[in-house]
Amino acid sequence: MRISSCLYGFVAHGAVFLFTGGCMLLAMAASLPFVFLLDRLPDVVFTAGAILTLLCSYAYVWFWAVRFAYNQKMRLFEVQLGSFVLLALMISLFLLDGSSMKDIMMNWDDAGCAFVPPAFTFLCLSYALVLLPVYQSKLWRLILPNGVRMKDIFHVFGDLMLIMVLLIGATLLFLSL
């Protein structure tokens, strides 16, 4: 096992995380005129747009990061391990104070210093633990060796959406217990 591939995964995930946060802030700033113009629309419309921007920027930057690793002949498992470590560290920050997962997922109070509620951030990070390795593997095995084809891209995103629906269903089931 080469430490450079693991370190690349760790650093790449940090860079992707910062870039995605910057894109989210830009999306929020760009949507301000529309919020004032379309004031009568529910907040869900603007939230859905922000989440879509977040997911697209995350997927796009990971595409370039995985493509670089593929071209540098790194091993996929080592890159995934490095990115997994950073995700696990971020999730562990939520659990350090002794809160249960159910308490964290029920905390939709955004009165603190964060832009988004802690539950939303925790769920995004938890879903990324499952979705990110799948996305990286699909890119590595399906898209990068064969070139970028729309058919393959739709196949990858279809698989990810199916997994996401299952994760949301499992979360709702967990919260109802």
Swiss-Prot record:
Cell compartments where the protein resides: Cell membrane
Main localization category: membrane
Gene encoding the protein: ywdE
Domain of life of the source: Bacteria
Residues passing through the membrane, by range: 45-66, 79-96, 111-135, 153-171
Protein name (database record): Uncharacterized protein YwdE
Membrane topology, record value: Multi-pass membrane protein
Entry keyword annotation includes Signal: yes
Keywords annotated in UniProt: Cell membrane, Membrane, Signal, Transmembrane, Transmembrane helix
GO cellular component, one term: plasma membrane
Signal peptide (UniProt feature, chain positions): 1-29
